Amino acid sequence: MAKQIFYTLFLFLLSTAILTASSSAPRAAITSKRAINFIQASCKATTYPTVCVNSLTGYANSIQTSPRRLAETALNVTVTQAQSTKVFVWRLGRFTSLKKREIQAVKDCIEEIHDAVDRLTMSIHEVKMCGSAKGRDQFWFHMSNAQTWTSAALTNANTCSDGFAGRVMDGRVKNSVRARILNLGRGTSNALALINAFAKKY
């Protein structure tokens, strides 16, 4: 008798678990689809929409349909990209075969990227503060800071790239660095566009 009761209870719990799993799966799929659609629509406002979609779609479940989380995620992705670029340029600077001008350009670029990382990190903080701002004035104070820091980070990326311009620079060094910086600049530009779009939603 006890075994029969236990078996019946087991079947009941198992069927409940299956029903719960089967009902939550479509909901998760719908949520993810809505989030992806939101990301795709939002990225149309950026200068590099394909880069925007490809870099942010993987975070759809955390972004959902929040303009603030979208901007914040774009900044986080760009910070990671900037840190990776900084390491790449630093390793490049350790090559003894570099010319004197190339060595100086690498050093200057590392400083620019370091500043970009700091400014993007501060921008992330400001965007977060926008989410808890009390009143219009407080929101725009943090928003203005976020826009300023991100714009400055974009300038840092462009300044680094300019240091490798001209025919004097070695083709391999110039091309490898500028390709990385180009991608960083695009990510930063997109993040700034999404911050501006978030501001318009307020």
Swiss-Prot record:
SUPFAM superfamilies: Plant invertase/pectin methylesterase inhibitor. Gene3D superfamilies: Invertase/pectin methylesterase inhibitor family protein. Induction: Induced in leaves during infection by Botrytis cinerea. Disulfide bonds join 43-52, 109-160. Disruption phenotype: No visible phenotype under normal growth conditions, but mutant plants have enhanced susceptibility to infection by the necrotrophic pathogen Botrytis cinerea. GO terms for cellular component: apoplast. Belongs to the PMEI family. Pectin methylesterase (PME) inhibitor involved in the maintenance of cell wall integrity in response to necrotrophic pathogens. Modulates PME activity and pectin methylesterification during infection by Botrytis cinerea and contributes to resistance against the pathogen. This is Pectinesterase inhibitor 11. The gene is PMEI11.
